[in-house]
């Protein structure tokens, strides 16, 4: 209404936004939805010549220490599970141990780097806020080639477990 420029940044993930990890279908599906909704919103705002930018942030290229694995601890009683879990929640320490057991080191991206990607992306009015990553670029290329050639997915990765 005011005509002032604005910018919306929606957060996705390489897990789902680029290609899913096979062991996390619910998470991957929501992150794929973030990308699609953002693309549609971008197009809709362009059609009405709104001065509102839209971006999709892919934080990373590695894991961020955001507390995601401990988010269940702050769940209020209102949103508590009606049936208790049969298995405990996975901790970041358990994920690190699983990765190490699978021969893969877990790497972290400082949140300050992600903040820089966001600020630079907003200033450049960039839709894709994606830090450089050889692994990510290769996954995108393989997914594109799979789709283009109508081949079965060969780019999918599994969560070590």
Regions found by a protein language model. Name each.
Residues 10:
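Rossmann-fold scaffold of SDR-type NAD(P)-dependent oxidoreductases
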Residues 1-5, 47:
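A short helix-coil junction within the Rossmann-fold of NAD(P)-dependent oxidoreductases
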Residues 13:
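Residue(s) in the substrate-gating loop at a strand-loop-helix junction
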Residues 18-25:
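Active-site loop immediately N-terminal to the catalytic Tyr-X3-Lys motif
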Residues 44-129:
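SDR active-site lid
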Residues 33, 40-41, 45:
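Conserved alpha-helical elements of the SDR catalytic core
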Residues 25, 33-36:
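Conserved cofactor-binding/catalytic machinery of classical short-chain dehydrogenase/reductase
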Residues 30:
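Active-site helix of classical SDR
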């Amino acid at each position: 209404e005011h005509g002032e420029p604005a910018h919306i940044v929606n957060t996705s993930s390489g897990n789902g936004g680029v290609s899913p990890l096979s062991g996390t279908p619910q998470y991957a599906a929501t992150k794929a939805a973030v990308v699609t909704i953002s693309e549609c919103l971008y197009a809709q705002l362009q059609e009405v010549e709104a001065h509102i930018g839209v971006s999709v942030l892919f934080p990373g290229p590695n894991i961020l220490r955001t507390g995601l694995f401990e988010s269940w601890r702050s769940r209020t009683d209102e949103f508590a599970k009606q049936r208790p879990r049969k298995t405990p929640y996975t901790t970041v320490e358990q994920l690190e141990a699983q990765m190490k057991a699978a021969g893969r080191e877990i790497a972290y991206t400082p949140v300050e780097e992600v903040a820089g990607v966001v600020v630079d992306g907003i200033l450049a009015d960039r839709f894709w806020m994606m830090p450089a990553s050889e692994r990510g670029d290769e996954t995108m290329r393989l997914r594109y080639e799979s789709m283009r050639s109508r081949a079965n997915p060969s780019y999918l990765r599994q969560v070590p477990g």
